[in-house]
Amino acid sequence: MARKYPLDKFRNFGIMAHIDAGKTTTTERILFYTGVSHKIGEVHDGEATMDWMVQEQERGITITSAATSCFWKEHELNIIDTPGHVDFTVEVERSLRVLDGAVTVLDAKSGVEPQTETVWRQADKYGVPRMIYVNKMDATGADFFRCIQTVKDRLKANAVPIQIPVGSEQGFKGMVDLIKNVAFIFYDDLGKDMREEAIPAEYADQAEEYRAAMIEAIAETDEELMEKYLEGEELTIEELKAALRKATIANEIYPCICGSSYKNKGVQEMIDGVVDYLPSPLDVPAIKGTTLDGEEDHRNSSDSEPLSALAFKIATDPFVGKLAFTRIYSGVMQSGSYVLNSTKGKKERIGRLVKMHSNSRSEVESLEAGEIGAVIGLKNTTTGDTLCAENSPIILEAMEFPEPVIRVAIEPKTKDAQEKMGMALAKLAEEDPTFKTWTDTETGQTIIAGMGELHLEIIVDRLQREFKVECNVGAPQVAYKETIRSAVKAEAKYAKQSGGKGQYGHAVIEMEPTEGEYVFENAVVGGAIPKEYIPAIDAGIQEASKNGIIAGYNVINFKVKLVHGSYHEVDSSEMAFKIAGSMAFKNAMSKASPVLLEPMMKVEVTVPEEYMGDVIGDINSRRGIMEGMEALNGAQVIRAFVPLSEMFGYATTLRSRTQGRGVYSMVFDHYDEVPKNIQEQIAGSRAK
């Protein structure tokens, strides 16, 4: 079957932003203008098409990354809606992995906010080309130029306006298109009556200044254009657009435009920008992976190559069961066919294939290279798995997810719901890799862990709504970690020889702190320990490191070198060496200056000037480390690093200290050492 749209007419892009910058509204407007939505869904009414889980509609925030296909000027657009709330970083990470480009939505009155920085860094990691859409130009305090300055200052990005606003706040009525050198003025509220006009006289000088800066920025990325520009030749619209497209795809320029999605101004121009400047699947590098033998391999974006696809999200649908959102990188996926899940080494049957429009769907026979759709009927596939042709296996790069930073104990209100709760939690953990659940071996309690209080609230909410399990939830606890500060040598001998077959294992290790993950190195020479026992020592060390010696928390950032040991011809066994490894680790850790680490949150508080002293005093009392302050539209923005353990219940405190006028956001940043006196308190309370 011939393709409906050639590959260069595809745009797989996401819309990313800080919470409340207007991301869902912007997506809704795109769906409205591209003809998929017949009624504009308002977040304020809890009606937005993309926000399809009940919790999202109640809270007015986007949690699940829904993929939607729509069409614009002979292009197929696949939009991945990403949440802006910090607790759902995993959803953003997941979507960025399968996007080719992104639109970063900024709030015109706030500019770059903490979550914008987090998401921007994640996009940098995957090299995703971006354009910037400054939204809410009609709001009080809107300032396009200050907004762009925050991008340059805080994101260190080469933000180049390709539009400037005509008016702002209540008087926002259009924009100057600097490439075409004309103005677009709106004469109605639905954005339908937009007229192309000459640039209003009062904006002529400003437009000339910004157009010259834009042309220079574009010319700097292209030698031929630079020559023409320096010789004083006029650059054509086609030349500017082609060079800007190239520079955007190369992440050399981030084009900036403006609008007000809520007032339907500027959205169509933004969709034009997506088509004009963001990459098609052919513009991004071939997807990399490895063969089953570990050799490097890659696949080009083409229907004729063997199938390779990535399942980037698992969702449970009330009508059809498990849906696996999948990006096809190469080849064609047919419904009813068999594929290999190369990550798990299992064969899977593709039941049905659907293209999603938020939470409605249309069934299709096949998904081709560059497309994003959902697969129904997969039994063993989880987030991040590769699906590929059985006769041409490839494993695409896995996705990385952060470890949870907060945990709570949870129990069903009735004993007979225990099994039901266990199954429900397992299902939710399958959908969300940053959500973990386990049973505490000491207390027998079920523990759930995630990226923040809101994250866990929503999990508990879903247990009740979707799985009909009512739960009692304990107080939140911080996921502390332990580590060491000095290098040591230690040994342990495990010997039991009292008649009959004994046990014997002896290991000598060197342990030192590292920046990265755990590393085990075998440096035993001369066969002091037989090779088959080495993995057992490694396993013993890893098992023991799950319970550090200060307060029983997971130990991180250390390296072990096995340097010597001994064995017994008859009595040695894997179990004996595993125990010896575990004992050696504990001996080493006790001598290696062990310390407790706690998650530090990057906190940003915006308060009216008169409350600033009070709020800073409160942050200091929470062991906060001030990072800086800046004035913003008559308010003060305070930035600090504060331990997560000190932030529980902060929303209530801030409300009462600022009479409800202060707002804050926080995002996990790094682990830091806990002060000695507090370390002793934590260790003491854990020992009780």
From Swiss-Prot:
Coiled-coil segments: none
Keywords: Cytoplasm, Elongation factor, GTP-binding, Nucleotide-binding, Protein biosynthesis
GO molecular function: GTP binding; GTPase activity; translation elongation factor activity
Pfam families: EF-G_D2 (PF22042), EFG_C (PF00679), EFG_III (PF14492), EFG_IV (PF03764), GTP_EFTU (PF00009)
Principal location: cytoplasm
Keyword flag rRNA-binding: no
SUPFAM superfamilies membership: EF-G C-terminal domain-like, P-loop containing nucleoside triphosphate hydrolases, Ribosomal protein S5 domain 2-like, Translation proteins
Record-level GO BP terms: ribosome disassembly
Localization in the cell: Cytoplasm
GO cellular component terms, A-Z: cytoplasm
Domain of life according to the entry: Bacteria
tr-type G domain: residues covered: 8-282
Cross-referenced PROSITE patterns: G_TR_1 (PS00301), G_TR_2 (PS51722)
Binding site for GTP: 17-24, 81-85, 135-138
HAMAP family (UniProt xref): EF_G_EF_2_B
NCBIfam families cross-referenced by the UniProt entry: EF-G, PRK12740.1-5, small_GTP
Described function: Catalyzes the GTP-dependent ribosomal translocation step during translation elongation. During this step, the ribosome changes from the pre-translocational (PRE) to the post-translocational (POST) state as the newly formed A-site-bound peptidyl-tRNA and P-site-bound deacylated tRNA move to the P and E sites, respectively. Catalyzes the coordinated movement of the two tRNA molecules, the mRNA and conformational changes in the ribosome.
Family: Belongs to the TRAFAC class translation factor GTPase superfamily. Classic translation factor GTPase family. EF-G/EF-2 subfamily.
Name listed for the protein in its UniProt record: Elongation factor G
Species for this entry: Clostridium beijerinckii (strain ATCC 51743 / NCIMB 8052)
